[in-house]
Amino acid sequence: MKHLLGLRDLSKEDIIKILNLAKDMKTILKSETKKTPHLQGYSVVTLFYENSTRTRTSFELAAKFMSANTTSISVQTSSVQKGESLLDTVKTLEALKTDVLIVRHSVSGVPHFIAKNCSFSVINAGDGMNEHPTQALLDMFTIRERLGTIEKLKIAIIGDILHSRVARSNIWGLSKFDNQITVFGPQTLIPPYIENFAKVASSLEEAVSGKDIVIDLRIQLERQKRGFITSKQEYYKFYGLNEDIMKFISDSTLIMHPGPVNRGVEISSEVMQLKNSTIDEQVTNGIAVRMAVLYLCTRKEGIYR
């Protein structure tokens, strides 16, 4: 059985395999029909226990463009509201002949639990504060497309590192390619032991200076159970990407953000519109990357053996 549960245990070779295939899938997206029969006859189900626009829509379009039969389950109107357990939901989907389940959950490890208790493929679309593997893969795809490489780069990740599954997946993925990773954010939002995996900068200016890529993160207020920041205004003043901080950033430095963006909090509208901003590209590339992942997870050789 083949799954994509995270980048921590994914090999460098498998990441390259996904990115290479995503390049081919992007060619299909540029065609007039945007259609391929690779998943014809397959049943792909999305099950999101958390809100999503980009990831859910991107996966659904990816499956449709590959001719899969797609079903989207709304947790709010499903039997979950009647007290159905996660395991029973999984067994129901199994009985309905699901081939691939794309799942997002607020609890870390849920995709791994499902993968151990089902016969279909499982793709992690974000689990708690753990990982968001396809977001990191599309970030890496965008970097490689823009810069020609994902190796030996200087990368800054700015913002709510503590609660960010995007940050974790990017650190796991990018660190496999001999990149120098620096993180910066409010001290309350920097996780313990992060020094084992990345350098912690002492200022925003230090963090972004001389970098090839700056990845800005969303403040995840929905995961914060106490006051990690004093106010959005203060956050923007000290940690936001604006015109003032751009003085320390090269015109060739990629400005990235996984979305959704809080304009005027994490990043200004003006910075988002710069030529070196890749925010819209990341959304487009997400479809190609997810097409590649769906293809590999439904093939015998797959991502995992």
UniProtKB/Swiss-Prot annotation:
<dbReference type="GO" id="GO:0016597">
    <property type="term" value="F:amino acid binding"/>
</dbReference>
<comment type="subunit">
    <text>Heterododecamer (2C3:3R2) of six catalytic PyrB chains organized as two trimers (C3), and six regulatory PyrI chains organized as three dimers (R2).</text>
</comment>
<dbReference type="InterPro" id="IPR036901">
    <property type="entry name" value="Asp/Orn_carbamoylTrfase_sf"/>
</dbReference>
<keyword id="KW-0808">Transferase</keyword>
<dbReference type="Pfam" id="PF00185">
    <property type="entry name" value="OTCace"/>
</dbReference>
<comment type="pathway">
    <text>Pyrimidine metabolism; UMP biosynthesis via de novo pathway; (S)-dihydroorotate from bicarbonate: step 2/3.</text>
</comment>
<dbReference type="GO" id="GO:0005829">
    <property type="term" value="C:cytosol"/>
</dbReference>
<feature type="binding site">
    <location>
        <position position="104"/>
    </location>
    <ligand>
        <name>carbamoyl phosphate</name>
    </ligand>
</feature>
<dbReference type="GO" id="GO:0006207">
    <property type="term" value="P:'de novo' pyrimidine nucleobase biosynthetic process"/>
</dbReference>
<feature type="binding site">
    <location>
        <position position="260"/>
    </location>
    <ligand>
        <name>carbamoyl phosphate</name>
    </ligand>
</feature>
<dbReference type="GO" id="GO:0006520">
    <property type="term" value="P:amino acid metabolic process"/>
</dbReference>
<feature type="binding site">
    <location>
        <position position="132"/>
    </location>
    <ligand>
        <name>carbamoyl phosphate</name>
    </ligand>
</feature>
<feature type="binding site">
    <location>
        <position position="55"/>
    </location>
    <ligand>
        <name>carbamoyl phosphate</name>
    </ligand>
</feature>
<feature type="binding site">
    <location>
        <position position="259"/>
    </location>
    <ligand>
        <name>carbamoyl phosphate</name>
    </ligand>
</feature>
<protein>
    <recommendedName>
        <fullName>Aspartate carbamoyltransferase catalytic subunit</fullName>
        <ecNumber>2.1.3.2</ecNumber>
    </recommendedName>
</protein>
<dbReference type="InterPro" id="IPR006131">
    <property type="entry name" value="Asp_carbamoyltransf_Asp/Orn-bd"/>
</dbReference>
<feature type="binding site">
    <location>
        <position position="218"/>
    </location>
    <ligand>
        <name>L-aspartate</name>
    </ligand>
</feature>
<dbReference type="GO" id="GO:0004070">
    <property type="term" value="F:aspartate carbamoyltransferase activity"/>
</dbReference>
<dbReference type="Pfam" id="PF02729">
    <property type="entry name" value="OTCace_N"/>
</dbReference>
<dbReference type="GO" id="GO:0044205">
    <property type="term" value="P:'de novo' UMP biosynthetic process"/>
</dbReference>
<dbReference type="InterPro" id="IPR006130">
    <property type="entry name" value="Asp/Orn_carbamoylTrfase"/>
</dbReference>
<feature type="binding site">
    <location>
        <position position="54"/>
    </location>
    <ligand>
        <name>carbamoyl phosphate</name>
    </ligand>
</feature>
<keyword id="KW-0665">Pyrimidine biosynthesis</keyword>
<feature type="binding site">
    <location>
        <position position="82"/>
    </location>
    <ligand>
        <name>L-aspartate</name>
    </ligand>
</feature>
<comment type="similarity">
    <text>Belongs to the aspartate/ornithine carbamoyltransferase superfamily. ATCase family.</text>
</comment>
<feature type="binding site">
    <location>
        <position position="165"/>
    </location>
    <ligand>
        <name>L-aspartate</name>
    </ligand>
</feature>
<comment type="function">
    <text>Catalyzes the condensation of carbamoyl phosphate and aspartate to form carbamoyl aspartate and inorganic phosphate, the committed step in the de novo pyrimidine nucleotide biosynthesis pathway.</text>
</comment>
<dbReference type="InterPro" id="IPR002082">
    <property type="entry name" value="Asp_carbamoyltransf"/>
</dbReference>
<dbReference type="InterPro" id="IPR006132">
    <property type="entry name" value="Asp/Orn_carbamoyltranf_P-bd"/>
</dbReference>
<feature type="binding site">
    <location>
        <position position="135"/>
    </location>
    <ligand>
        <name>carbamoyl phosphate</name>
    </ligand>
</feature>
